[in-house]
Amino acid sequence: MSRKKTIKDYENLAATRNHEVISVSNKETPSQGDITLLCKTCNKEFTTTTISYQNARKTGCPHCKATSASLYWTGRARTKTPEQAKKNAEIKEHINKTRKEKGKAFANIKNKEDLKEKLTNDLYLPNGEKNAYNDFILKRLNDPVTGKMMEKHHIIPLHAGGPDEKWNLISLTPEDHIEAHNLRYLVYNETGDKNTIKFRNKTPNVTDQISKAKALGNETRRAQGTGIYEPGMSSKAGKIGGSVKSVEKDLKQSTKMTSGVYDALYNGSRWKHTKTNTEIVIPPNTIVKMPQLVEKLIEALPPCEEKTRLAGAKLTTATSALARVIKGKNEGGRSSYFGWSICKE
């Protein structure tokens, strides 16, 4: 059991931060109260909880923190760099293109009656269960609910390729709007619906529903030949996984990479293993994430101790270490990791 902290402990901590303790609200148990201090750096008083002050990453003075932030941004641009702006534009373009492709499935729907027919035809799932979302929407279309506060809901969501047309809209109460996305998430297991529910701050207990949601979504994808059942998908490590890249996610990750790591992944690189004299060339645009590089380096090695150790290393540790190898020892990185070094022409 750790020793109970006293006022003296907080006075000593304050002294190291150039602060002076003025008062403590809970003298019996200081760690459970508030503390008021004088910052001798900015000559201002501030009050915070003792726990917050104790765990502060720097001095804990909000005035000094605000001043430091202001000085940091003085003369600095807060806008995106041209590279980041370009990548964000690529992400947006890809999302719009994906939605347009998905929207082709609904090109034959021209009005509300066509939509009702579509919902009715898809009223039952491949496993024989009723499509709870379609059933809910059909009931609201046939027997509209009125109220003072109504919200517009896209019956076929925009994220699923639905158009922003009058025939694709329905007026729902706020409660029904949340329920609609909840039911659709249960049936189709799409992230867009889940995020909408979270945004409304009324997230259902997904933990209790996840098994049913996955089962229903799995049946739907199996019948439609999409997702993990799309031709060209592969199985690995006992789990069904997709070979189709999440382009949006990859592009977002690339904006956070250092220029060296970005070049090594997207523009290609050559690696050499010292002990086994193994070399591997990573062609441009074949891998886009550091975990993929780790996998390539493991596969390239013949059976040896370092291959076993690399395969058993924690993935975050391996990716971080290889990023430092790419950076180079002269730049504050490292020269190699488990024998692998990058060949810089």
Curated annotation (Swiss-Prot):
Residues annotated as transmembrane: none
Keywords: Chloroplast, Plastid
GO molecular function terms attached to this record: endonuclease activity; nucleic acid binding; zinc ion binding
Database matches in InterPro entries: HNH, HNH_nuc
Entry keyword annotation includes Protein biosynthesis: no
GO annotation, cellular component aspect: chloroplast
Location of this chain's protein in the cell: Plastid, Chloroplast
Pfam families, A to Z: HNH
UniProt keyword Chloroplast present: yes
Taxonomy, superkingdom: Eukaryota
Protein name, per record: Uncharacterized 38.5 kDa protein in psbA intron 1
Provenance organism: Chlamydomonas moewusii
